[in-house]
Amino acid sequence: MADVKKQSFQDMLDYVHLYRLKNKLHRETADNDRKIRDNQKRVLLLDNLNQYINDSMTVEDIRAIIANMRDDYENRVDDYMIRNAELSKQRREIRQKMAAHKTAASEKNEK
């Protein structure tokens, strides 16, 4: 009996170890995907910048292009922040509804 419990406990530890390892690998894969996406965006940005720049441009012209691009990206960041806030609000509302359902279900079971 003790051997069965010991083996069962060892099986559980192995399962937990594998589960944590799987999650770690998932996080590393997601991190690598973000790095790939970020670097692809950088390449695209440089390609776009290269299309705008020609040999007759002055340094001031190039700086103006970069400033415009920066403003565009900052506006996008602001838009994403607003979108995240809206999503956060929706998640909070859903959590409250789920808690209300859970409370109602437990009260129903008590009766």
Curated annotation (Swiss-Prot):
Job description of the protein: Pole-localizer protein involved in the regulation of several cellular processes.
Predominant place of localization: cytoplasm
InterPro entries assigned to the protein according to its UniProt record, in alphabetical order: DUF496 (IPR007458)
Record's keyword terms, sorted: Coiled coil, Cytoplasm
Protein's UniProt keywords contain Lipid biosynthesis: no
Similarity remark: Belongs to the pole-localizer TmaR family.
Coiled-coil region: 70-104
Any one cellular-component term (Gene Ontology): cytosol
Higher taxonomy: Bacteria, Pseudomonadati, Pseudomonadota, Gammaproteobacteria, Pasteurellales
Cellular compartments annotated: Cytoplasm
Database matches in Pfam families: DUF496
Record's protein name: Pole-localizer protein TmaR
PANTHER family (alphabetical): UPF0265 PROTEIN YEEX
Recorded superkingdom: Bacteria
Chain residue ranges for the region called Disordered: 92-111
